């Protein structure tokens, strides 16, 4: 039995889980998320305030799907109830970011500013040199944060660029010069 897959997913108050036609849908105060699944691999049983994910056989691929769909369901329930947040830190002279409507506009030391379209379901706030990305979908929040970070990743000598708040950049020593 999968260690991840056998654990039940708790459903908090105000969250509804629906499973029908190969799609499981989770609806809550922060939004509505849905995900299709392999009906030949797993079943979902809604029992009161929790959901159990069971697999139909013991094949290798089915066991992989078992843990995967349980994790996806758990992340969706967490997302629609509390949401997910990623914080990016901008470090560099003249580097700045601002939200203009549905665009995140950033000056990152190049001749032109970067304009990134904020996807549907994602909320972006800029607090001085921090960009706070939040939303119900863990995948969408992480994907957008990665896309923004990729514009100017942190460099190891001075630490300039965009990094995650909890990311530790391994610093390097510059050239020492011959005397």
Curated annotation (Swiss-Prot):
<dbReference type="InterPro" id="IPR019906">
    <property type="entry name" value="Ribosomal_uL6_bac-type"/>
</dbReference>
<dbReference type="GO" id="GO:0003735">
    <property type="term" value="F:structural constituent of ribosome"/>
</dbReference>
<keyword id="KW-0699">rRNA-binding</keyword>
<dbReference type="InterPro" id="IPR000702">
    <property type="entry name" value="Ribosomal_uL6-like"/>
</dbReference>
<keyword id="KW-0694">RNA-binding</keyword>
<dbReference type="GO" id="GO:0019843">
    <property type="term" value="F:rRNA binding"/>
</dbReference>
<dbReference type="Pfam" id="PF00347">
    <property type="entry name" value="Ribosomal_L6"/>
</dbReference>
<comment type="function">
    <text>This protein binds to the 23S rRNA, and is important in its secondary structure. It is located near the subunit interface in the base of the L7/L12 stalk, and near the tRNA binding site of the peptidyltransferase center.</text>
</comment>
<dbReference type="GO" id="GO:1990904">
    <property type="term" value="C:ribonucleoprotein complex"/>
</dbReference>
<dbReference type="InterPro" id="IPR020040">
    <property type="entry name" value="Ribosomal_uL6_a/b-dom"/>
</dbReference>
<keyword id="KW-0687">Ribonucleoprotein</keyword>
<dbReference type="GO" id="GO:0002181">
    <property type="term" value="P:cytoplasmic translation"/>
</dbReference>
<keyword id="KW-0689">Ribosomal protein</keyword>
<dbReference type="InterPro" id="IPR036789">
    <property type="entry name" value="Ribosomal_uL6-like_a/b-dom_sf"/>
</dbReference>
<dbReference type="InterPro" id="IPR002358">
    <property type="entry name" value="Ribosomal_uL6_CS"/>
</dbReference>
<comment type="similarity">
    <text>Belongs to the universal ribosomal protein uL6 family.</text>
</comment>
<dbReference type="GO" id="GO:0005840">
    <property type="term" value="C:ribosome"/>
</dbReference>
<comment type="subunit">
    <text>Part of the 50S ribosomal subunit.</text>
</comment>
<protein>
    <recommendedName>
        <fullName>Large ribosomal subunit protein uL6</fullName>
    </recommendedName>
</protein>
């Amino acid at each position: 039995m999968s260690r991840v897959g056998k654990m039940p997913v708790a459903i908090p108050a105000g969250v509804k889980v629906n499973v029908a036609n190969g799609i499981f849908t989770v609806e809550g105060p922060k939004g509505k998320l849905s995900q299709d699944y392999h009906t030949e691999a797993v079943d979902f049983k809604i029992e009161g305030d929790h959901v159990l994910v069971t697999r139909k056989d013991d094949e290798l691929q089915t066991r992989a799907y078992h843990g995967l769909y349980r994790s996806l369901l758990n992340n969706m329930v967490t997302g629609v109830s509390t949401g997910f947040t990623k914080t990016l830190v901008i470090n560099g002279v003249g580097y700045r970011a601002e939200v203009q409507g549905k665009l995140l506009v950033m000056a990152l030391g190049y001749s032109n500013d970067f304009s990134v379209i904020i996807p549907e379901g994602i909320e972006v706030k800029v607090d001085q040199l921090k960009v706070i990305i939040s939303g119900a979908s863990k995948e969408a929040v992480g994907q957008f944060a990665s896309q923004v970070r990729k514009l100017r990743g942190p460099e190891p000598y001075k630490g300039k660029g965009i990094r995650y708040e909890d990311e530790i950049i391994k610093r390097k020593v510059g050239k020492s010069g011959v005397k």
